């Protein structure tokens, strides 16, 4: 019953999300440290963190990197990655969020799972009820029953590290009203279980209705919200430069046509231009490098085409060579 209402394609390691965006090595380290310190209770303010920024700023890459880190370290977490460009319709369905989080918590917490299973047997119609009712019956009330000692025993963690719940791409849920409703429900749940070590990391664009909900809900006013705006990240340009250097190094080391490359290509001037044109939208740099690194083409010619695109911002996206890389994503970004 529970699994049938989940969005399995929205999980951090789902097959549908093969090769998801993530932070390149040695990039966004300060942002990641701030998030990890907040999760680990070294930063005491906020039960909820809002990671925001414009399209392509790197929100999903950071969320994916944090989620994978928790998985690798066997630290309990649950996640949901919305996506409007996914082939899976479940990844834009806001009604799938709560069951999917509950499902993951059931895998982590044996006693919690028993409580949830009993509730589902008693009321198999629970997923036909409101999202508020689902969250109260299957999330808030069961977790309120746990003492702190019992909670940490359940998550099998010797250190008091909170349970992390990640919701990425909330703005890509298909219905803006549902987006706001889910935010309100998360805020109410966070307030109800504030004595439990649980953190909610929400990543989204700063859409007006989402910003308004964060600004107006009383829970977020009472020192329970922490914000990170990637558009204001002073390290964005350095992170993009580090990424570009790493990717061009790979081309020099392994591209089929690497022996035709100038050993000093590209120049620092070109790297600086790419950083200037990309920052703070990391996705432009990553899309450009996918295009340039194509094994069937000459990288220097591809870079020249990219530079031509970046210097003709008024040209239609259909004429831009970058559109051949991840075409649906590219068109989605540049035709907004």
Predicted regions and their residues:
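Conserved NB-ARC/NACHT P-loop NTPase core of NLR-like innate immune receptors
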Residues: 1-336
């Amino acid at each position: 019953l529970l699994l049938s209402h989940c969005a399995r394609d929205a999980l951090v390691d789902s097959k549908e999300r093969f090769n998801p965006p993530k932070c390149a090595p040695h990039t966004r380290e300060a942002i990641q440290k701030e998030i990890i310190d907040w999760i680990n209770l070294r930063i005491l303010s906020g039960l909820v963190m809002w990671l925001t920024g414009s399209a392509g700023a790197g929100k999903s890459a950071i969320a994916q990197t944090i989620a994978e880190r928790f998985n690798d370290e066997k630290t309990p977490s649950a996640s949901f990655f919305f996506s409007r460009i996914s082939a899976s319709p479940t990844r834009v369905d806001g009604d799938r969020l709560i069951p999917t989080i509950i499902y993951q918590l059931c895998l982590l917490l044996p006693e919690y799972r028993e409580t949830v299973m009993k509730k589902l047997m008693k009321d198999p119609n629970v997923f036909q009820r409101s999202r508020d009712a689902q969250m109260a019956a299957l999330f808030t009330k069961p977790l309120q029953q746990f003492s702190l000692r019992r909670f940490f025993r359940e998550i099998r963690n010797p250190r008091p590290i909170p349970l992390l719940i990640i919701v990425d791409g909330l703005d890509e849920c298909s219905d803006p009203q549902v987006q706001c409703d889910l935010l309100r429900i998360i805020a109410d749940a966070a307030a109800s279980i504030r004595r439990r070590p649980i953190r909610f990391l929400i990543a989204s664009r700063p859409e007006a209705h989402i910003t308004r909900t964060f600004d107006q809900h009383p829970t977020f006013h009472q020192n329970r919200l922490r914000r990170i705006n990637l558009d204001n990240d002073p390290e964005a340009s350095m992170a993009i430069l580090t990424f570009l250097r790493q990717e061009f190094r790979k081309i020099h080391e392994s591209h089929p046509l690497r022996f035709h490359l100038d050993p000093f290509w590209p120049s620092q001037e070109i790297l600086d231009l790419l950083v200037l044109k990309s920052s703070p939208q990391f996705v432009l740099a990553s899309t450009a490098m996918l295009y340039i690194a194509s094994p069937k083409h000459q990288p220097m010619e591809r870079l020249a085409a990219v530079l031509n695109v970046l210097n003709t911002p008024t040209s239609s996206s259909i004429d831009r060579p970058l559109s051949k890389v991840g075409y649906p994503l590219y068109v989605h970004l540049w035709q907004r």
